[in-house]
């Protein structure tokens, strides 16, 4: 592998956030999402037992889901045959299970969807959750993204795409706005926020960090990986917001 650096989550213990049996039925990206959602819920002082669960939803994006599951189960097919594949392979690997598991572990029974837009998945999820509240579909939304694809296939794929930095200096690896930048660092983790309708938040005395006042989303219609030169569509997206 040309790439020598990745941003791993160290010291994560799923059992601190969920029971062992539940954790065994999730891959890391789902575990991270559930842990982050529970932390966000606690930080927001949101008491789900006092909420209408049908007015609380979640939109959690994941660009890839679990490549590690695909690798592991494919090895089983080659070595032991297709009958030995884990019956939970599909629900372990598919991207929407981050949102699904957040719903299960928070008790949110409202809108539950997943956004898959590569590196923009988390931001798009927050924007779509904002819209759900704005349109009156929910009072509260868990929103964000989760990813865990530091595995042979993930590293090889992004390396072949020439998307990752090949520097061996951790201090000079992730420098996106530097003239010497050479790619990004493959990382993992989750980020979840609690979005809430303003009057609903005020009524329960929530500590409000910030207000989302706009959201824009569009596409370049240009190239599968490269942004259009000139940044016209990026500017248009900001204007839409």
Outline where the language-model segments fall.
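A glycine- and small-aliphatic-rich helix-loop capping segment at beta-alpha/alpha-beta transitions
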Residues: 68-82, 132-135, 155-168, 229-233
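Catalytic nucleophile serine of serine hydrolases
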Residues: 119-121, 216
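Short loop/turn motifs at secondary-structure junctions
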Residues: 54, 137, 207-208
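Conserved beta-ketoacyl condensing-enzyme motif
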Residues: 1-117, 146-155
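Anionic group-binding determinants
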Residues: 43, 124, 241
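Condensing-enzyme catalytic core mediating Claisen C-C bond formation in acyl metabolism
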Residues: 169-240
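Conserved beta-strand-centric core segments of catalytic alpha/beta enzyme folds
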Residues: 1-18, 32-39, 62, 101-104, ...
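Conserved donor sugar-nucleotide recognition element shared by glycan-biosynthetic enzymes
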Residues: 95, 99, 122, 234
């Amino acid at each position: 592998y040309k790439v020598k650096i990745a941003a791993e989550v160290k010291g994560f213990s799923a059992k601190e956030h969920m029971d062992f049996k539940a954790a065994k039925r999730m891959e890391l990206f789902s575990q991270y999402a559930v842990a982050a959602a529970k932390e966000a819920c606690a930080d927001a002082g949101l008491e789900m037992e006092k909420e209408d669960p049908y007015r609380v939803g979640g939109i959690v994006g994941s660009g890839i889901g679990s490549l590690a599951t695909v690798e592991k189960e494919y090895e089983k097919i080659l070595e032991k045959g297709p009958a030995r594949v884990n019956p939970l392979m599909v629900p372990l690997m598919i991207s929407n299970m981050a949102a699904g598991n957040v719903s299960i572990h928070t008790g949110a029974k409202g809108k539950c969807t997943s956004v898959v837009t590569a590196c923009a998945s988390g931001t798009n999820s927050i924007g779509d959750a904002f819209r759900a509240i704005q349109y009156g579909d929910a009072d509260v939304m868990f929103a964000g993204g989760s990813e865990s694809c530091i595995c042979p296939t993930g590293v090889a794929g992004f390396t072949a795409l020439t998307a990752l930095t090949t520097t061996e200096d951790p201090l000079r690896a992730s420098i996106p706005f530097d003239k010497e930048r050479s790619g990004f660092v493959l990382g993992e983790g989750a980020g979840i926020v609690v979005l809430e309708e303003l009057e609903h938040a005020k009524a329960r005395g929530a500590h409000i960090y910030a207000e989302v006042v706009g959201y824009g989303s569009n596409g370049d219609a240009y190239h599968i990986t490269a942004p259009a030169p000139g940044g016209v569509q990026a500017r248009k997206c900001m204007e839409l917001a």
